[in-house]
Structures are given as C-alpha cells and as structure tokens.
C-alpha cells in the first residue's frame, strides 16, 4: 500500500472530486464499494433479497491482486470516453505512473493503481464498471464491493456458464487475473461475502433467508478475543476490559447486522471463562487466591468452605479447568465480572442488530 505525501493526497482528492459527479450516475446500482451513501451492509442485504427470490446459485469471483494489475492503457482509454480535459488526463496518468518507493529506491509502476490514496478507489470502480455493464446487459443479478464479486443465478448449469464467460471477459478484455483456487460456483448459502454468509431456514412451511457471520470471520473474532483476554497479559484487568469493550463495540458496528444471538451467547460464556482463568493464573499462590476470593464477597455464607473447595480442586487442575469449576463460578459470577467492566455482549448485540437492520433495510429500499 502506498502512502502519498500531503501534496499528493490533496491533488488526488481534488481529482477524485471532479471524477465522482461524472461517474456516479454511470456506475451500476449493484456496485457498493467506495461510493457515497453505499455500504457493505447494503450489499449483503441485496444478496439476501436475491436469494429470497430464488437466485440460490452463486458465482463467487476472486481477482488476484486486483489493485496491482489494472492495465494503465486500458483504464486511460475508458476514462477518455467521458473526460476530455487534457490536463486532468495527464494528472491521472501521472498518478498511475508515480511508482512506489521500497527501501529508499523508487520503482516505476507499469500496472496497477497505488493503494492508500484518495484517487485509487474511484479508478478501481471505473475499471470494473466495464464488467458491471456487461453483467447488466446480460440481465444478471449481482453484487460487487470493489473487487469482491458475487453473481447469482437460479441453477448450477447457469452458474457454470456465467463463471466461464466472466472469466473470459475479465482476463481477456480487462486483462485481470481470476484466482482459480478462491473463485467458486456453489449454493449461495454458506459462501463468504464481505465477512458474512447467508443461511436458509423453514418456518411453518415458508422458506426464510437470513444473514449470519461466516465461520472464518468468527474464528478471527475468537482469536482476537483470546489474545485480549490471554492469561498472562501484562495489562491490568481494568485496562483489558476497557479495551475489550471498545473492541466489541467496534466489531458489532459491522457484524451486528448478522443473526448470531446463540453464537454470541456461547462466546460470552467462553470469554468469561477466559477471564476467570486469567484471574486464577495471575493470583498464583494458594494464599493469594484465598485472600482475593475472600475479598470479593465478604457477606456470603459459608464463603470459606467454597474457597476451600476451589483450592483443593486446583491441586490437580490448571486455570482453564478451574474457570469451569462451579464453586469458583459462583464467586467470580457473571454479575461480579460485569461490575468490574466485563461487557454485556448480548445486550450490546441486540441493540446494535435492531438499529443496523432497520437502518440498512431503509437504505437498500432507497438505493434499489
């Protein structure tokens, strides 16, 4: 990714502001990436609507190093159809040819659009708009977010044909490279798109389509939570929980659209276990553990017996097993963990989910 200078960024922004009002009316309604008043949420909701209408087979196209492989000559020819100001054309071409610096050495760029600048996203959309127009001419339903492309059809046979013709156009006409290993044809439910996936369920004989988080995205989330709450973290518990809450809030701002109440119930319980294991590990000695536990709930009847049971169990079990031990859970209860800052994940999700679904559904109706 390139990091332009302040002057370069200002020039790029000026050029982008000139191009945007010209190309926005020309872009497809099925293009959602790097465009005003459009979002990834709108894209996945549109895909859900297509699936509900019977478009249950998908052509998932992955482009290899898309931003690095844009053909400069072809891109400039596309732009010249609508832009006739020679100064502007020269500026755009200079941006494309500006090169990249590696270890203090500038290398010329013969292809691609430098990432990290203000101009690159709109140039990338201008380039792939050629593919969007082809799909629309052929009557295909699709969603594209930058170089993430999902085309939906009604049958496997149609999907195979679309994959073949799309690959021919992208590689032959646009001179891009389709990643054969990651591009696939299959039932739309289960395929990953922008971190989400669709699922189908039957209720009272009626087929319903929903949105949930893709397993790969969920794994990344769990790995991040694990790293935040790891037993031997050097942060204080207060700092850890403050950061954890902020991370959950930011994560839900995007993934809160998904149906995942049960998933988050499970993860909340798992995260609380991680925190209990961290407490037990950091307290280290039986004496310190006894003292810490006795201070948590001083008015609890038979507290010393409960703490004693914890210490006896710990002789043969490590922190992770201890975190599931009922007597320890009764002291380091959910209520206690929340009192020291553990986030109410399910409550945060429900608030975020309702807000996102209502807002994005209104936006999709407006856009479509």
Range-by-range predicted roles:
Residues 1-368:
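Non-catalytic terminal/accessory segments
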């Amino acid at each position: 990714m390139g990091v332009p200078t302040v002057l370069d960024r200002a020039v790029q922004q000026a050029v982008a502001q000139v191009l945007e009002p010209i190309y926005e009316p020309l872009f497809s309604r099925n293009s959602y990436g790097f465009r005003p008043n459009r979002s990834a949420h709108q894209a996945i909701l549109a895909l859900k609507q297509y699936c509900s209408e019977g478009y249950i087979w998908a052509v998932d196209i992955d482009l290899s190093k898309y931003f690095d492989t844009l053909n400069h000559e072809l891109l400039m020819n596309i732009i010249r159809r609508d832009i006739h100001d020679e100064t502007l054309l020269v500026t755009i071409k200079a941006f494309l040819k500006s090169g990249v610096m590696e270890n203090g050495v500038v290398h010329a760029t013969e292809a691609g659009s430098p990432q990290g600048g203000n101009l690159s996203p709109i140039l990338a959309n201008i380039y792939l708009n050629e593919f969007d127009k082809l799909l629309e001419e052929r009557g295909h339903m699709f969603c594209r977010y930058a170089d993430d492309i999902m085309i939906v059809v009604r049958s496997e046979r149609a999907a195979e044909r679309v994959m073949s013709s799309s690959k021919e156009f992208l590689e032959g006409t646009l001179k891009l490279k389709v990643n054969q290993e990651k591009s696939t044809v299959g039932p739309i439910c289960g395929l990953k798109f922008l971190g989400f996936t669709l699922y189908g369920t039957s209720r009272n004989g009626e087929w319903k389509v929903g949105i949930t988080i893709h397993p790969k995205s969920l794994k990344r989330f769990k790995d991040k939570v694990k790293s935040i709450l790891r037993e031997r973290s050097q942060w204080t518990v207060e700092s850890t929980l403050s950061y954890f809450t902020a991370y959950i809030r930011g994560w839900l701002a995007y993934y809160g659209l998904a149906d995942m109440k049960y998933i988050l119930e499970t993860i909340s319980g798992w995260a609380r276990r991680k925190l209990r294991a961290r407490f037990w590990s950091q307290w280290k000695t039986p004496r310190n553990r006894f003292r810490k536990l006795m201070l948590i709930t001083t008015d609890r009847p038979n507290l010393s017996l409960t703490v004693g049971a914890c210490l006896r169990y710990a002789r043969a079990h490590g922190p992770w097993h201890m975190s599931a031990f009922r007597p320890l859970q009764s002291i380091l209860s959910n209520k206690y963990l929340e009192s020291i800052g553990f986030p109410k994940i399910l409550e945060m999700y429900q608030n975020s989910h309702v807000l996102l679904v209502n807002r994005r559904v209104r936006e999709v109706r407006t856009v479509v």
